[in-house]
């Protein structure tokens, strides 16, 4: 993730083609600057949200992918209901939506896919913990 717009050209020079803006970690002004700089350099932008208020703020980033992170940044606990709570705010966004973190089972993945317009998921911890069973892999 980025905290200064001067990081973006450097990342681009190292081959990056996208940046992550975590709205909980930057001011509104800086989020705008990061977004504009990335677009200027023909890079994709993922805007990450954790709350309904951040989701409302993210709607102005029309060319971004928006990720709903199910991890509470204060407690580090995950809850996929975060995606359900925030999704309705983002239905007008024309770009891709991503549900991030906390997806532990095939049933949770299917529930998110069936009850929202989201078809893109970031799954990390569950995949690493399930390397032997591979049960979640069969859904992907």
Residue ranges and their predicted role:
Residues 8-29, 67-76, 116-137:
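Glycine-rich phosphate-binding active-site loops on the catalytic face of alpha/beta enzymes
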Residues 59-87:
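Glycine/Thr-rich beta-alpha phosphate-binding loop at enzyme active sites
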Residues 34, 38, 86:
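Aromatic/hydrophobic pocket-lining residues that form π-stacking "cages" and hydrophobic walls in ligand
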Residues 80-90, 127-140:
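C-terminal helical cap(s) of enzyme catalytic domains, especially alpha/beta-barrels
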Residues 39, 91:
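Anion (oxyanion) recognition and catalysis
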Residues 3-15, 50-62, 93-123, 135-139:
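Catalytic cores of alpha/beta
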Residues 1-4, 17-28, 42-55, 67-77, ...:
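Catalytic beta/alpha-barrel core
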